[in-house]
Amino acid sequence: MREHFNDGVEFARFLAHRFVTDKAPNSAAALTYTTLFAVVPMMTVMFSMLSLIPAFHGMGESIQTFIFRNFVPSAGEAVETYLKSFTTQARHLTWVGVVFLAVTAFTMLVTIEKAFNEIWRVRQPRRGVGRFLLYWAILSLGPLLLGAGFAVTTYITSLSLLHGPDALPGAETLLGLMPLAFSVAAFTLLYSAVPNARVPVRHALMGGVFTAVLFEAAKTLFGLYVSLFPGYQLIYGAFATVPIFLLWIYLSWMIVLFGAVLVCNLSSSRLWRRRSLPKLIVLLGVLRVFHQRQQLGQSLRLTHLHRAGWLLPEDEWEELLDFLEKEQFVCRAGGGEWVLCRDLGAYSLHRLLNRCPWPMPSRERMPASLDEAWYPPFQQAMERLQVEQEALFGESLAHWLADGTSGAKVT
């Protein structure tokens, strides 16, 4: 039990480190800024899509009220009034204004995809038709699915009102869980569809549940803070709603991006526990696997590397690929696979050590043994090198910098 608890704590630390490394707070700030400009266009597009289906006529306002009631703290009530007014005015825009709103909505989706691709270490973002179709699906199918879900909720409510609370057993509980269910569905769809990477549905669902629960908890705590510490009203007066709403948007995006970090790393949860090896040794191991598969006329992907015993997380794999591609060791073969495109017989280890951005490991960091045929002679060579370095540079700095030491003096 204690071991599982320690593993959980270590995994949480790992996620927090990845969250900061992936610049998620900066991405959340950028998304907050974009949301300010995109929230009205998104709502306008939603109302436009719902108006195309006669059964959903007049449902847009009800959905907007539902969203603010269940997904925004009580401080957002004043903002809801302003947004309703802005959205109503936006429906009377000319076609030039409509195009501008559509571009603004697409900009928000581009920012979301960029943040997710940063977390998933995606090297090749979507382009052209693929990106347009994804965004169009989100802007068109999203409101329709939301409208369908809201129609089901309305039906359950009316059934209970007309035929009594016993008409549908558990209807009250079901209605109470609807906001959470909508959140889970939305986050699951977001995590599975937006990154330009393969995301297992099971992991996306787990991340959706985690994010939805965290979102509900944050909404409750944020509402308590606003009600118990109203000092911001003394500072901002009539404008107090604006900074509070901005803070809530930023906090919401922080939660969404942390959920994305969780989903991304669920597939590599067994890899973070491994004892980290010096990057130089990992690089040599990866080159050995590349060389071996080159002899067989085969390409390499991360799963092949795992089967060979090198359990690299995806971010470390991408980091190594960046160096190997820059040094023209490997070339992309398509489908996420890579091939060795350089003759290793014409490239010395000395040259690799000079070009490698990672330092040579100290004796303490070198593993005692490694199931690789090349490692024992490499380990001996590194030990000899360090002995020679200590013999040459073992004297104190005072000895080297004292007056009268050998060596030319720069004038």
From Swiss-Prot:
Chief location category: membrane
Membrane topology: Multi-pass membrane protein
Subcellular localization(s) per the UniProt record: Cell inner membrane
UniProt GO cellular component terms: plasma membrane
Record carries keyword Membrane: yes
Domain of life per record: Bacteria
TM annotation in the entry: 36-56, 92-112, 132-152, 174-194, 207-229, 244-264
Record keywords: Cell inner membrane, Cell membrane, Membrane, Transmembrane, Transmembrane helix
Keyword RNA-binding recorded: no
HAMAP family to which the protein is assigned, alphabetical: UPF0761 (MF_00672)
Database matches in PANTHER family: INNER MEMBRANE PROTEIN YHJD, UPF0761 MEMBRANE PROTEIN YIHY
Family recorded in the similarity comment: Belongs to the UPF0761 family.
Annotated protein name in UniProt: UPF0761 membrane protein PLES_43641
Species assigned in the record: Pseudomonas aeruginosa (strain LESB58)
